[in-house]
Amino acid sequence: MESQLYLVTKFGPEIEEKGLGCVAQKKIKRGTLILREKPCLLQNINTTGNNDYFDDIFTAYEEMDSDLKDRFFELANFYDHIEESNVYHIGRRDVYLTYLEENPKPYPEGVALKVLQIVDTNGFHNGVCLEMSRFNHSCVSNAEYFWNEDVNARDVRAIKYVFQYDLCFLP
């Protein structure tokens, strides 16, 4: 997972809770395209209601090849931490489990639940991008993302000068 502008890397033990992040491999000027990526899991942004939303997620997931699914399951899952403490967003787990009970999938419920959790953790308004999901969040970001309709991909651009070895952050 390397490009000329950034490297996805694991942080050292001093900030281990961050996991992976994107580090600039050279100076990046404001306005520079850092990443253009088509989502591995593309969703219809016009779905209404939980069932349509979840159906759309599983349709996209089931269209992935096995390599893409493996990479998808390597993404962060906010719920791993939550399951240890058993503190969920109010009712979210119940919504997931009710949907899965009413709409069983041809794979174990645990896999289906993990799909929903990973989308919730890494999704942007119309899907999940494997590389872009490795960019960390900051309220003081140095890059921004948007949907590029001309190429049907998500673009990440520097919004300020990024020095070599700085982390690239998204809002």
Task: Describe every region a protein language model picked out.
Residues M1-P171:
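Conserved catalytic SET/PR domain of SAM-dependent protein methyltransferases, capturing the structural core
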